[in-house]
Amino acid sequence: MLEYAIEDFFHFLRIERGLSDNTLSSYKRDLTNYLQYMKDHDKTATWDKISRTDIMGFLYMLKDQGKSTATISRHISSIRSFHQFLIREQITSNDPSLHIETPKKDRKLPDILSQDEVDRLLEIKMNTKLSVRNKAMLELLYATGLRVSELISLNVSDLHLMMGFVQCFGKGSKERIVPLGDTAKHYLEKYISEARDSLIKKNNREDALFVNQHGRRLTRQGFWKILKGLTLEAGILKTITPHTLRHSFATHLLENGADLRLVQEMLGHADISTTQVYTHVTKARLKDMYQSYHPRA
């Protein structure tokens, strides 16, 4: 059965590759679509029978469904990894995905906040335990550029305030050390000393750094709800995503002369080309500023 090979592949990704739940979910979604297409087209005997033409048919179906270039590219990547696994495990000697080209993605510059907008967002009135937590969270995000998944995965033991850094685990469980500024340190100390113990209440075995009103680890959805509320309070009309502060962190560093390699290291990017997108953001902002303020623009 075709399904068994896919289940073995997921086990390999989880145990041997140590991929995160989010990444595993993406693989599962992509390969479930792929398997269903093959079943719908009577390709259910063995993976040996799958051809390049079959895969191209699947990709054309995705295109006809209006899927984005990025989504199609991700499916291709998942399919390639799966067929390489089949060869590695000697389930098949045929790799029909070998010469399938990935479509070129349209470069979409990430949305960022201006320095003034960041300042407005971070002007949180700390009149409740939860607002003290929110202030500490956003100050930490803007100070470090952490991914939201990294933020909510932090434990208290990952925070090293005396030494001025936070220890986090990014994609593929790769560890990195990110420095903290004095402002973020101050509000984290305030949160830990004044709010966290009250929030965890009787759930004092909770290791999570950031917890919800029930004393349990904050979820991604919970963080997103908080961020949307704070954005409205700050009167920011831009469309904000959970990664907006990460994008703003990187762009503001580069605008102020930071070295690209250092920004890459702080963001935890494996490939510097991923970080280079932020240099395009700074150039676009510079062009906009020129057009707005130069008398002969």
Curated annotation (Swiss-Prot):
UniProt keywords, alphabetically: Cell cycle, Cell division, Chromosome partition, Cytoplasm, DNA integration, DNA recombination, DNA-binding
Domain Core-binding (CB): 1-87
One Gene Ontology cellular component: cytoplasm
Domain of life per record: Bacteria
The UniProt record lists the keyword Acyltransferase: no
InterPro entries per record: CB, DNA_brk_join_enz, Integrase-like_cat_sf, Integrase_catalytic, Integrase_recombinase_N, Integrase_SAM-like_N, Recomb_XerC, Recomb_XerD
One Gene Ontology molecular-function label: DNA binding
Signal peptide: none
Gene Ontology terms: biological process: cell division; chromosome segregation; DNA transposition
Primary subcellular site in the record, as a coarse category: cytoplasm
SUPFAM superfamilies on file: DNA breaking-rejoining enzymes
Tyr recombinase domain residues: 108-291
Pfam families: Phage_int_SAM_1, Phage_integrase
Subunit-level organization: Forms a cyclic heterotetrameric complex composed of two molecules of XerC and two molecules of XerD.
NCBIfam families named in the record: PRK00283.1 (NF001399), recomb_XerA_Arch (NF040815), recomb_XerC (TIGR02224), recomb_XerD (TIGR02225)
UniProt cross-references to PANTHER family, sorted A to Z: PHAGE INTEGRASE-RELATED, TYROSINE RECOMBINASE XERC
Function: Site-specific tyrosine recombinase, which acts by catalyzing the cutting and rejoining of the recombining DNA molecules. The XerC-XerD complex is essential to convert dimers of the bacterial chromosome into monomers to permit their segregation at cell division. It also contributes to the segregational stability of plasmids.
Designated name of the protein: Tyrosine recombinase XerD
